[in-house]
Structure formats: structure tokens, C-alpha cells
């Protein structure tokens, strides 16, 4: 038997859920296939969303009509603003979630999406389009076949997945779930080069066996925060957590009376005994014994790797994070490990707060297949097979947020492919999502890729606070958000621009009355005429103070005040980055034809020629960012493009 769809999404992790939602919202009849429908968007590792750069991605996903931000807000047990003392470019939200509640809310949300069908099935094979159907054929373990002109693979860690703890190894996509073996074979048969990557997860502890009096409290924010954009103009507010019943009584110091109920996290530190136990057992560590072949993420190393690499460090911080409102299971952030089970028990019990701890689940490593760099284009489509899209860990990334961002863009572009519309490609100056995808299509990924603020050249323009101003107008044009939401965002943009213009034009003079009013509200007096914007540019001055001192200033919403303050305090830096973007866009707008012949370019180095032919950059800007390409190579390509254009004009 067979059934036909417009778009088929294989895998329902964070990438697959966003991909299926976007494709269905854009009018495509969409099928989401997953091994277990009860584990949609399952948090296999850390029960958290956000962090530096990752939080920016989630804000952008929400601004584009995606799901991750709002479901995080509804399932969060704690939310915090990181890097609060630093500038707005690197400030980022991070939330602890109830992992089972998150998965349930995602499933309930997707079940209500028109045009979207959910099916529980193991995908065994994928066959390319043939002349008769012009569709991919996706075959499940029962033999049922599904046909579609566009398929999105979001396979996570399931491609030939292998779990490892000590000397024990077993096939698994994650603990308790079978790997996808045949799918790897099909991808290899289609010509896709596969690489082996590795990730890991820490033990989970029984909260009742932890001495929380020996831990350091990590409370949630006292100030309302959210990943989703909520507009009071539309009657929206930050939603409360959707849990049923009181929190598990094992967690001390719950924050139940603030702006929303929250649970704290708790910090402990490793000990000299902890380090000694690991060193004595390195010969049993799969990471060092040769059992593990895959390359792991450099920026999220296992605890045994930390002890070896940072041998001079006396202790490492570990965070005990509740996995939900009503569960006693506690995640040990910072303790990823694949050491043997007895070693895990011994090392954790060497920490004073964990002397009597019981492990509910042991830590393990997962090895899995990913597709080598250079196989996808900027629309998430594969170079070898048009209509086939990849998103998430199959592209060599790590992290829920990176996966969700790719899934969203793959879903949009798969829908556009089916509908004959042009692809949607975000630039590096438009979004962190654009930086992420550009890196995946222009850089050699030798280890699991993680997003950082340092990867974004224009991070002061790509802040979390302005994600909707940057991206919601596009989402409205695409059909991912409604007109009411877009209108509110546009009104805020206009209010911000008008307020900034007023403040740059409004001058105040150093009279006795003005200075007395400024000082009365905690603002240093002025000695010469200045604009309101110049006063607000002072780091310590807030708009509310200034308006109290100068009552004729306009009343503004909190959202507009935030934009106005950033616009004044960072105006010079913002203007500089905008000039850099303008220069860069000249290169980005210079398209390189897909069939451009690099073999005939005189003067182009052999290394550059090989790189260019492998990655086939779409623009001159992309070409310049490829590893192994220097400015001289770019100049040769530019000269050839101009000559080709001149020849076409002459003809």
C-alpha cells in the first residue's frame, strides 16, 4: 500500500517538529514519521533550552512563527537571563524545562495543525524519484510506502546509532530506542559521504538521595522573561507553566510566589577524589581505549576528557537540574560520561552533597552517522538529489536549538520547492539562523557544530530583543504569522524610530531648573547643551529616570523603551556594523551561476579550484568565506564574472 503527500518529514525531534509545522502552515499536505509518537521533541540530553547564541536562535524561531519558544515558556520550570552584566549582543535567555511536559505540549500542538498527519513508524528505506511518480518513496518497517516530491531527513543520532558505556555497546538511537541501520545504507548508496560523530549524556540522580544543604542555590529570574514574543496589544501575556499538581517535595527552596512558579537548580563541584577515580580508570574509558571512533563536540566535552585536558584545574562545577515539576530525576549538567557504571557511582559519591546518591540512569555516549560537509545548499536541500532536505544532527550540528532552526528553514524551503516558489535564505546580517546555515554550507565541519555569539560578525544587530523586528515581517510575507501580529511589530518599529528621532533632535540646556530636576532623579547634571539621546547614551541612565526628570518626553511601552535605550547607548557601534553590512552585501548580491566553470579560470590555485567545485558557492561572499579561499582567488572569480557578464551583453 502507498500514500502520497507533498512533504514527508522523517524524524520528530526538534528539527522534525519545526519542519513539519512550517511545511503544513504553508499549505503542504505533510506527513511526520517517528519511531515513537510519545517522544516528539524529546529532550534526550539536557532538559534546557537556550543559552548564549542558542537563546538567540529560539527567539528567531519564534519570530518566524516556529514552536520552540512558546512551548519552552509553557513547560519551563525556571528561566534566567545570562550575561546580564554584559552588553545586549551577548545577553541570552536560558530555561530549564519539564522535559515530559515539553514533549506532550509539542505533540498536542502538532495534532491540531491543519494539513499535518502524524504516524508512528520506523523508516527503513528511502528511494529517489523515478520517471513514473516523480516522487521519493519512503518505506516503513511494515512495508507501507509513502510518496512525496520533497522529503526532509531529521534523523538525529539514529543513523547507525551505537550507545557505549565502559566496555558495553549496543545499537541505539538513544537509550531504549533502536537505531536506523538501513537508512544509512541507502544514503551511502545514493552517494552521500558519511562521517562518524559522537555525543554523550550524564547520569540522572534520585533527588531524595541528594543532600541539598551542601549545594549552592541557582534560582530563577525574579523578572518576567520569555522566549516567545507576546503582545499586550493582542491580549497576549507570558503563559504560566502548564503542570498539574504541586512540585515534587524533594526540591528545597521552590519559588512559588513570584511572577511565575519556578524551581531552582543547585551547584556542586568535583573533588580531588573525583579526579583521582577518573584518572585511575582512564584505561577503561571508551573515549581513550579506542572503542569510541566518532568525533565529539569540543565545547561540550565529557567529564573524563575535562580531567585529562585541564589537569591543572582543581575542580569543575556541576549543576544539578530537576528534569520536571513532579519527577525526582535530576540531570547532572557538566558530567557527560561513558565511563563504566561502577566508576560513575564512585566518582559521583565522592562529592559531599552526593555521598549517598542513587543513580536512576547511567551516563553513556552515542556514536552516529552524519553527512559530510558540502552536501547541502543554503536552502537545506542536498546537492545530489533535488527535493531531498537535511536538518539537524545529520548535518553535523549539536543542540536542540540548532536543530530546530534548521528544521524550520528546511520546512519552509521544502514547501516552496513543491509549490515552485523561490527558496528562502537568511543572510549572516539578518539572523543567527543565517549564520548557522551559512557556516554549514561554507565551512568544513570536523566536529559537532555548536552556535556561539562569536560566530556572528554582526551580533550587535542580531540581538535577542529585536528578533521580531528583524524577522516577523518576513514571516508574515511567507504566511507563517498572521496580519495582526505583523501589524503590532510594524507599529513598534515605527514607534521606536520616531522616538529615537525625537531624542536625537530634542536639545536640553544646562539651566539651574533642568540640572536640579536631573539630579533629583539620579542623573548627573549637564554643563553644555546636549540632546536627550546623548544623556540616554550614558550607561547608568534609564529612560524612565529621564522621563521623570523631563516629563514632556513621550510615554513609551517597555518594548519600545528597550529598543530606544539600546539605540542610544550603542549608536556608534550599531552604525559601524551597518556600514560593514552594506559593504558585505555588495559581495553577497553578486551571484555565481551554478554551472560556473572553475576549471577554466587562469591563475586560480588548484586548492581553491577543488574547494570551489566541491562547495559550489552561490555568491561571491560565500566563496570568500570558504576555507582555503583567499582574496586573490575572489578577485579572479570576480573578474571572470564581469567578463562573462560583458560577453552576454555583447551577444
Curated annotation (Swiss-Prot):
SUPFAM superfamilies: FAD/NAD(P)-binding domain. NAD(+) binds at residues 296-310. It is found in: Cytoplasm. Keywords: Cytoplasm, FAD, Flavoprotein, NAD, tRNA processing. Its cofactor is FAD. GO terms for molecular function: flavin adenine dinucleotide binding. Homodimer. Heterotetramer of two MnmE and two MnmG subunits. NAD-binding protein involved in the addition of a carboxymethylaminomethyl (cmnm) group at the wobble position (U34) of certain tRNAs, forming tRNA-cmnm(5)s(2)U34. This is tRNA uridine 5-carboxymethylaminomethyl modification enzyme MnmG. It comes from Chloroflexus aurantiacus (strain ATCC 29366 / DSM 635 / J-10-fl). The gene is mnmG.
Amino acid at each position: 500500500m502507498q500514500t502520497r503527500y507533498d512533504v514527508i518529514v522523517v524524524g520528530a525531534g526538534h528539527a522534525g517538529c519545526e519542519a513539519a509545522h512550517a511545511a503544513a502552515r504553508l499549505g503542504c499536505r505533510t506527513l511526520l514519521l517517528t519511531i515513537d509518537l510519545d517522544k516528539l521533541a524529546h529532550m534526550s540530553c539536557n532538559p534546557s533550552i537556550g543559552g548564549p547564541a542558542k537563546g538567540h536562535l529560539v527567539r528567531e524561531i519564534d519570530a518566524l512563527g516556529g514552536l520552540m519558544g512558546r512551548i519552552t515558556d509553557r513547560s519551563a520550570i525556571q528561566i534566567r537571563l545570562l550575561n546580564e552584566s554584559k552588553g545586549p549582543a551577548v545577553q541570552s535567555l536560558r530555561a530549564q524545562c519539564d522535559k515530559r511536559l515539553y514533549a506532550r505540549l509539542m505533540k498536542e500542538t502538532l495534532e491540531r495543525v491543519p494539513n499535518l498527519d502524524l504516524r508512528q513508524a520506523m523508516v527503513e528505506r528511502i528511494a529517489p524519484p523515478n520517471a513514473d511518480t516523480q516522487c521519493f518513496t519512503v518505506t516503513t518497517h511494515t512495508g507501507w510506502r509513502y510518496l512525496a516530491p520533497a522529503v526532509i531527513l531529521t534523523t538525529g543520532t539514529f543513523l547507525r546509532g551505537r550507545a557505549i558505556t565502559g566496555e558495553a555497546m549496543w545499537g541505539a538511537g538513544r537509550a531504549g530506542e533502536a537505531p536506523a541501520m538501513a537508512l544509512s545504507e541507502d544514503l551511502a548508496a545514493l552517494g552521500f559521504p558519511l562521517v562518524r560523530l559522537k555525543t554523550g549524556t550524564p547520569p540522572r540522580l534520585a533527588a531524595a538521595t541528594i543532600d541539598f544543604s551542601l549545594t549552592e542555590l541557582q534560582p530563577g529570574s525574579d523578572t518576567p522573561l520569555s522566549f516567545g514574543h507576546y503582545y499586550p496589544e493582542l491580549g497576549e501575556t507570558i503563559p504560566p507553566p502548564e503542570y498539574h499538581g504541586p512540585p515534587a517535595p524533594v526540591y528545597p527552596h521552590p519559588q512559588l510566589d513570584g511572577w511565575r512558579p519556578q524551581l531552582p537548580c543547585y551547584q556542586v563541584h568535583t573533588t580531588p577524589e573525583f579526579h583521582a577515580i577518573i584518572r585511575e580508570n582512564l584505561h577503561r574509558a571508551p573515549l581513550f581505549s579506542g572503542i569510541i571512533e566518532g568525533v565529539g563536540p569540543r565545547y561540550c566535552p565529557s567529564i573524563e576528557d575535562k580531567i585529562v585536558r585541564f589537569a591543572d584545574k582543581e575542580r569543575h562545577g556541576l549543576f544539578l537540574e530537576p528534569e520536571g515539576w513532579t519527577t525526582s530525576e535530576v540531570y547532572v549538567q557538566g558530567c557527560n560520561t561513558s565511563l563504566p557504571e561502577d566508576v560513575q557511582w564512585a566518582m559521583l559519591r565522592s562529592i559531599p552533597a552526593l555521598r549517598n546518591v542513587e543513580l536512576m540512569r547511567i551516563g553513556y555516549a552515542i556514536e552516529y552517522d552524519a553527512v559530510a560537509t558540502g552536501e547541502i545548499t543554503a536552502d537545506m536541500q542536498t546537492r545530489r538529489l533535488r527535493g531531498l532536505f537535511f536538518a539537524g544532527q545529520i548535518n553535523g550540528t549539536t543542540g536542540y536549538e540548532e536543530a530546530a532552526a534548521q528544521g524550520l528553514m528546511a520546512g519552509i524551503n521544502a514547501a516552496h520547492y513543491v509549490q515552485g516558489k523561490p527558496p528562502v535564505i537568511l543572510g549572516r546580517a539578518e539572523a543567527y539562523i543565517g549564520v548557522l546555515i551559512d557556516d554549514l554550507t561554507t565551512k568544513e565541519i570536523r566536529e559537532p557544530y555548536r552556535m556561539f555569539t562569536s560566530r556572528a560578525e554582526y551580533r550587535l544587530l542580531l540581538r535577542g530583543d529585536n528578533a521580531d523586528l528583524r524577522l516577523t515581517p518576513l514571516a508574515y510575507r511567507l504566511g507563517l504569522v498572521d496580519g495582526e501580529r505583523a501589524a503590532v511589530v510594524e507599529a513598534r518599529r515605527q514607534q521606536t524610530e520616531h522616538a529615537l528621532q525625537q531624542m536625537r533632535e530634542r536639545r536640553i540646556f544646562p539651566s539651574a531648573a533642568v540640572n536640579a530636576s536631573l539630579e533629583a532623579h539620579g542623573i548627573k547634571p549637564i554643563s553644555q547643551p546636549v540632546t536627550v539621546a546623548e544623556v540616554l547614551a550614558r550607561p547608568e541612565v534609564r529612560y524612565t529616570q529621564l522621563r521623570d526628570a523631563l516629563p514632556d518626553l513621550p510615554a513609551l511601552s517597555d518594548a519600545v523603551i528597550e529598543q530606544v535605550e539600546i539605540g542610544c547607548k550603542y549608536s556608534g557601534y550599531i552604525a559601524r556594523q551597518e556600514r560593514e553590512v552594506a559593504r558585505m552585501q555588495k559581495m553577497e548580491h553578486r551571484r555565481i551561476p551554478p554551472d560556473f566553470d572553475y576549471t577554466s579560470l587562469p591563475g586560480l590555485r588548484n586548492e581553491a579550484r577543488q574547494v570551489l567545485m566541491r562547495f559550489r558557492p552561490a555568491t561571491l561572499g560565500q566563496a570568500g568565506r570558504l576555507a582555503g579561499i583567499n582574496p586573490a582567488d575572489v578577485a579572479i572569480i570576480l573578474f571572470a564574472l564581469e567578463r562573462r557578464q560583458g560577453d552576454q551583453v555583447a551577444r
